């Protein structure tokens, strides 16, 4: 591993040859979660590139998908421990959980009908994230997780054309976990493989392929629900990973023929709900979505993700420096945002818990995540628009960036850190982006009112604390925290239009290597403009 002992430590490490993840010394066999510090590069997460294990994963029965030999040799959860961890799994990262029906899954689990490989993966991830105290000193968990990540390359895990549902769930969970806990090009590539395999077997067209092919026509309605849920989780992961990295989405929204997950009865003749070909139609499917209260949160989450994807496409145009039509594209997506906000159920954008509606705290936070998506979309659009303005007409657009960041900070002000583990930590990309632009706002020479500056400082404090709470669980969030702290220390201001315009021109994506590299050297770049 390369060592860099000067600030910002993690940026130098992240931009080295292997992006984020470096191979450990040959005598290192386990994957340790780090205690990250500014001068402790050796403690950053690593993973080993072990040879793949041969697993019988294309079988039809769960018994054929046995536990990875390297894991089974040293991981021995007792039955009570395993049952506790599997039950607890449904309390964490709920909006990223690929299992549609908890009750059905637990029935199958207690009947020994689930793949032991999947059960082991769920148990290890739950134990790691919840700091499960009932299992030795954690070394065996680290070794088991290392084995799962290094021996579960997708080309081996999902070999053949028809991997089982449990095998695909396992592959998804590992891709999700690695992306947030051991970020880097390995995790990004793993997500890409999962997404492409989903296309290969037809998850993007479940409602069409089921009619044509016998192997899908015999799948039960309950299992089809589970496959649908898995597809839309992959859709979210494709969104987060590529939007954060500034790379094109692998999934094409225009050609998806897999309906949303709904709890329909046989007597319910309502039509299934599909992602509209035209993004203008997102608001039109909301009445059908809201009619199914059990899946309401889940499906609106997907709709707001789809909206955020549209803003990401505009960012791609910004990356390519396409001047023609970009302002019109910004206006078009903003119209879609406005329509969607108005079409949402009454009180959906309320920052506080809807107590009169008996909204549970966990549902309140799940709803807040969808509002974060909408605010992030607005922030991205505002950044692009501001970058198109000249010195004589940029202030109104610069103010809109502040408005979007303040809206995000208002959401953070209602956040209970106890729920950081219950949601997808991809929200940290939004928090980080808002922090960067709030710092630029407070250092710009456009802010003369001390009360406004004080409000901005408060917003930064709230968002910084929220990011640190996520960082107590996830490596990705810890790295983003370090990035913001380093950037805020290096850029002192006051910043004029020329400085801000330079920074806006360099913005590509929250985790794009060139953007992070620029943040690490922003002081010298800004001083050159003096």
Which residues are covered by each model-predicted region?
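Charge-rich, intrinsically disordered regulatory segments
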Residues: 1-116, 137, 228, 272, ...
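C-terminal, low-complexity intrinsically disordered regions in eukaryotic proteins
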Residues: 5-6, 21-22, 444-445, 451-530
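Acidic, Ser/Thr-rich, low-complexity intrinsically disordered regions in fungal proteins
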Residues: 15-20, 24-27, 83-295, 316-328, ...
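Long, charge-rich low-complexity segments
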Residues: 162-182, 351-352, 359, 369, ...
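Solvent-exposed, amphipathic alpha-helical segments
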Residues: 300-318, 382-385, 438-441
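A conserved active-site cap/scaffold subdomain adjacent to cofactor or substrate pockets
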Residues: 301, 327-330
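Hydrophobic, well-ordered secondary-structure elements that form the walls
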Residues: 379, 408, 435, 467
């Amino acid at each position: 591993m390369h060592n860099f002992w000067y600030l910002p430590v993690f940026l130098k490490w992240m931009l080295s040859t292997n992006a984020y993840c470096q191979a450990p010394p040959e005598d290192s066999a386990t994957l340790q979660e780090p205690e990250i510090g500014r001068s402790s590069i050796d403690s950053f997460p690593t993973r080993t590139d072990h040879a793949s294990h041969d697993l019988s994963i294309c079988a039809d029965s769960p018994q054929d998908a046995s536990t990875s030999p390297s894991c089974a040799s040293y991981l021995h959860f007792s039955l009570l421990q395993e049952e506790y961890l599997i039950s607890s799994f449904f309390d964490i990262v709920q909006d990223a959980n690929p299992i549609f029906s908890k009750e059905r899954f637990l029935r199958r689990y207690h009947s020994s009908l689930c793949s032991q490989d999947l059960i082991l993966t769920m148990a290890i991830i739950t134990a790691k994230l919840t700091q499960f105290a009932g299992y030795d000193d954690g070394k065996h968990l680290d070794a088991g997780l290392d084995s799962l990540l290094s021996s579960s390359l997708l080309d081996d895990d999902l070999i053949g054309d028809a991997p089982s549902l449990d095998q695909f769930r396992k592959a998804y969970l590992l891709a999700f976990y690695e992306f947030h806990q051991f970020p880097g090009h390995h995790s990004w590539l793993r997500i890409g493989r999962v997404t492409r395999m989903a296309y290969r077997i037809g998850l993007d067209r479940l409602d069409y392929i089921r009619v044509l092919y016998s192997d899908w026509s015999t799948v039960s309605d309950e299992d089809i629900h589970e496959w649908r849920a898995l597809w839309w989780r992959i859709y979210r992961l494709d969104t987060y990973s590529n939007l954060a990295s500034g790379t094109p989405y692998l999934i094409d929204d225009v050609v998806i023929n897999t309906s949303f997950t709904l709890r329909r009865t046989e007597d319910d003749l309502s039509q299934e709900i599909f992602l509209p070909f035209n993004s203008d139609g997102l608001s039109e499917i909301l009445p059908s979505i809201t009619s199914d209260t059990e899946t309401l949160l889940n499906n609106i989450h997907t709709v707001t993700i789809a909206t955020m994807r549209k803003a990401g496409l505009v960012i791609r145009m910004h990356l390519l420096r396409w001047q023609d039509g970009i302002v019109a594209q910004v206006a078009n997506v903003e119209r879609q945002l406005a329509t969607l906000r108005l079409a949402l159920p009454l009180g959906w954008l309320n920052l506080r818990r809807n107590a009169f509606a008996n909204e549970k705290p966990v549902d309140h936070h799940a709803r807040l995540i969808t509002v974060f998506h909408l605010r992030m979309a607005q922030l991205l659009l505002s950044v692009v628009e501001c970058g198109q303005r000249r010195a004589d007409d940029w202030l109104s657009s610069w103010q809109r960036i502040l408005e979007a960041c303040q809206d995000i900070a208002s959401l953070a002000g209602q956040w209970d850190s106890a729920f950081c583990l219950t949601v997808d930590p991809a929200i940290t990309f939004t928090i980080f982006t808002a922090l960067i632009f709030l710092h630029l706002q407070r250092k710009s020479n456009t802010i003369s009112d001390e009360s406004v500056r004080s409000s901005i400082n408060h917003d930064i404090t709230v968002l910084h604390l929220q990011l640190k709470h996520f960082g107590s669980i996830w490596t990705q969030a810890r790295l983003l925290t370090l990035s913001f702290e380093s950037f805020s220390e290096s850029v002192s201001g006051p910043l004029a239009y020329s400085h801000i315009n330079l920074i806006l021109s360099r913005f590509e994506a929250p985790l794009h290597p060139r953007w992070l590299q620029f943040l690490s050297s922003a002081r010298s770049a800004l001083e050159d403009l003096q």
